[in-house]
Amino acid sequence: MSKTFFIDTTRCTACRGCQVACKEWQGFEGNQTKQVGWGSHQNPPDLNPKNYKVVRFSEQKLKDRVAWNFFPDQCRHCVDPSCKYPADEYKKGLVILDEETGAVIYTDACRDMPKDVFQQMLDFCPYNIPRRDEKTGVINKCDMCVERVKEGLVPMCVKAC
């Protein structure tokens, strides 16, 4: 049975525990970031090959105060993933939809994909999620901690929240 994420943004305090748990589970080091001139506490500023999840900050000026809204952003693991179409046009099997969990998985073979095909994948994704590591060619994003989910556990970001 396919799984999905439900994030109650009214309860999110932007602690970034989900973001850190994901990085630790994936074995990623911290990103070098700087806040100067950025004007936000969002850190890092966007998803990247070493950040599959980022807590987005949205500041709103209300009548008499400023309000912050937070949204943990990551792959939505679409039921019909549009990012899969350009990959399949290029070569079948690069992007798979795990039937047991519903996770959209980018295989290691994606690293050989030309940059223009990757750009089409990014353009097709309505959430602007996939990222390519320019050094290694690896295309990556949240994998829903598929190995944990298959063992009956929750993804690390969910566990941390």
Locations of regions flagged by a protein language model:
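Non-ligating segments of multi-cofactor redox enzymes
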Residues: 1-160
